[in-house]
Regions:
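Short beta->alpha connector loops
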Residues: 47-50, 71-76, 196
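Short acidic active-site motifs
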Residues: 52-56, 77-80, 172, 176
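Bacterial carbohydrate/catabolite-sensing allosteric modules
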Residues: 29-40, 58-62, 85-92, 96-207
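Amphipathic helical "hinge" segments at domain boundaries
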Residues: 1-67, 145, 152
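Short, ordered loop/turn segments at secondary-structure junctions
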Residues: 46-48, 73, 95-96, 133
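Acidic, Gly/Pro-rich loop/turn segments at junctions of secondary structure
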Residues: 67-80, 92-102
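Redox-cofactor binding/interface segments in oxidoreductases and associated redox assembly factors
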Residues: 13, 70, 192
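Short beta-strand segments enriched in small/hydrophobic residues
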Residues: 3-19, 73, 119, 127-134
């Protein structure tokens, strides 16, 4: 009973960038499920991590949250594996970071990328570019692997020139698309690792 009285019935959801529309549907689903179980949801934006770090730590120390849900691949503050054991329960969703040793809910990024690239091939495209995310992120590694495997399955040689990288921002997508368009034989279709980069790529392609 004492434990029940000390519960805040509040979950902190850490979002890499609250401005990314990709997360809106995910957050809505989290809030609906949390409400059904009598929990409130706090949203923490990691886009300005240095400013927010103290706030997140204060919430934990003062026991104002019962759990954390990470939608990115990083903790919003430094904590060793040993220190993580003293934190509220944490689950990672959408991303995959083996080094954090957290329970994880995520999609099969390799298969999803393979299917997307294979679809482009079935539409008649042979020169398929890729705007990949940061190299250090596991999900980007798997998505790039899916891209490469799909091309090989379709009998298309992988051309490193057709792979550009960005940091999941609109501007990065735009720059990466321009890089691909500047090639002597630009791709006729492009597979993007994120919706926001895809929007930037589309904007650049229409200029």
């Amino acid at each position: 009973r004492n434990v029940k009285r000390n519960e805040s019935r509040t979950i902190l959801v850490i979002v890499p960038d609250i401005c990314d529309p990709f997360f809106s549907e995910i957050i809505r689903g989290i809030e609906v499920t949390a409400a059904n179980h009598g929990y409130l949801v706090l949203i923490g934006d990691c886009a300005h991590q240095n400013q927010q770090e103290k706030t997140f730590i204060d919430l934990i120390i003062t026991k104002q949250i019962d759990g954390m849900l990470l939608l990115g691949s990083r903790l919003p503050f430094d904590a060793s594996i040993e220190e993580q054991r003293n934190l509220p329960p944490m689950v990672m969703a959408n991303e995959f970071a083996p080094e954090l040793e957290l329970p994880t809910v995520h999609i099969d990024n390799l298969t999803a990328a393979f299917d997307a690239v294979n679809y482009l091939y079935e539409q008649g495209h042979k020169r398929i570019g890729c705007i990949a995310g940061p190299e250090e992120m596991p999900l980007c590694h798997y998505r790039l692997q899916g891209y490469v495997q799909a091309l090989r399955r379709c009998g298309i040689m992988v051309d490193p020139q057709y792979i550009a990288r960005g940091d999941f921002t609109f501007e990065a997508g735009s720059r990466a698309m321009q890089q691909l368009l500047d090639l002597p034989q630009p791709p006729t279709a492009v597979f993007c690792h994120s919706d926001v980069m895809a929007l930037g790529a589309l904007s650049q392609a229409k200029r």
